[in-house]
UniProtKB/Swiss-Prot annotation:
A family per Pfam: ATP-synt
Protein name: ATP synthase gamma chain
Family that this chain belongs to: Belongs to the ATPase gamma chain family.
Keywords tagged on the record: ATP synthesis, Cell inner membrane, Cell membrane, CF(1), Hydrogen ion transport, Ion transport, Membrane, Transport
GO BP annotations listed: proton motive force-driven plasma membrane ATP synthesis
Domain of life: Bacteria
Subunit description: F-type ATPases have 2 components, CF(1) - the catalytic core - and CF(0) - the membrane proton channel. CF(1) has five subunits: alpha(3), beta(3), gamma(1), delta(1), epsilon(1). CF(0) has three main subunits: a, b and c.
GO cellular component, one term: proton-transporting ATP synthase complex
Gene, per the UniProt record: atpG
GO molecular function: ATP binding; proton-transporting ATP synthase activity, rotational mechanism
Main localization category: membrane
Organism: Rickettsia typhi (strain ATCC VR-144 / Wilmington)
InterPro entries, alphabetized: ATP_synth_F1_ATPase_gsu (IPR035968), ATP_synth_F1_gsu (IPR000131), ATP_synth_F1_gsu_CS (IPR023632)
Length: 288
């Protein structure tokens, strides 16, 4: 009987866990849908900024100041700034593994070349792993906010601009997961600084630029950095929720399979007990 009680207790426990994983799956699905809408709304904006930044500075009317040139030229013998986006929470499968592995490989490669490295880490999971080996490289760590990401984006943008203006870094790379679907996230390594200058005449023809004041270019640089960080952040968040939804769906299905096996085991145990009792009753009756 004690065995039956243990099986019933375990079935109850697994069912309780299954309810939690199912709820987490639904929450992640809801969050993923909302963020996908935000990404869709921002796609035109990021595309327009990219095109403008890659063309406007090749036009003769736009002359870069010394301060502005720092965003377009590689500063020799300066640090490589690596911005690593991971998750704040777990239960999202292998979501963080690929990014952390890539960052470790790149750090090793840069260190072997004798180059300087600065790390900015977003997300508790990435920070907990990377601080064990690379604490001396970590410049900043930011927690992922549950909502309202604008403040984090502004903080990151200001840190990047300060580092460039003070000649602390030679380039800046963002590591994040790009969303393909709920089951697939693409590891993305995007170089955002120095800003590449090239001219696409087919694009320039669609724009009419008017130079208004000396702050035009610096304002565009601000918009460019904000857009790049915002894009990476949203992609990483929706990828995390997709990975978590998939992981929780798998956990829910596994729990269902385990419940079926435990119920079968429970029924067999009960059947064995009943059969044993019947045999004892029959044996007793025959003895009489």
């Amino acid at each position: 009987m004690s065995n039956l009680k243990q099986l019933r207790t375990r079935i109850k426990s697994v069912k309780s866990t299954q309810k939690i994983t199912k709820a987490m799956q639904l929450v992640s699905a809801s969050k993923m849908t909302k963020i996908k809408t935000q990404i869709a709304n921002s796609n035109f904006y990021i595309e327009a900024i990219n095109k403008m930044m890659s063309n406007i500075f090749s036009m003769t009317l736009c002359e870069l100041s010394i301060e502005e040139q720092k965003f377009f030229n590689t500063m020799p013998s300066k640090a490589n700034l690596l911005i690593v986006m991971t998750s704040e929470r777990g239960l999202c499968g292998m979501f963080n593994y690929s990014i952390i592995k890539q960052v470790k490989n790149d750090i090793k490669e840069l260190a072997n070349k004798g180059e300087q490295i600065k790390l900015i880490i977003i997300g508790k999971k990435g920070y907990e792993v990377l601080k064990r080996q690379y604490a001396n490289y970590i410049d900043s760590y930011f927690e992922f906010p549950k909502s309202h990401y604008a403040n984090l984006i502004l903080q990151l943008k200001e840190k990047i601009m300060y580092a460039v203006e003070n000649l602390e870094i030679s380039n800046c790379i963002i590591y994040f997961n790009k969303f393909k679907n709920a089951m697939t996230q693409i590891l993305t390594k995007q170089k955002i600084l120095p800003i590449e200058k090239h001219r696409d005449y087919s694009v320039v023809e669609n724009y009419h630029f008017e130079y208004e004041g000396k702050n035009l270019i610096s304002n565009l640089i601000n918009l460019y950095l904000y857009a790049k960080i915002n894009y990476a952040l949203l992609q990483n968040i929706v990828s995390e929720e997709g990975a978590r939804m998939t992981a929780m769906d798998s956990a829910t299905n596994n729990a269902n399979d385990l419940i079926s096996k435990l119920v079968l085991k429970l029924n067999r145990s009960r059947q064995t007990i009943i059969t044993t009792e019947l045999i004892e009753i029959i044996a007793g009756a025959e003895a009489v």
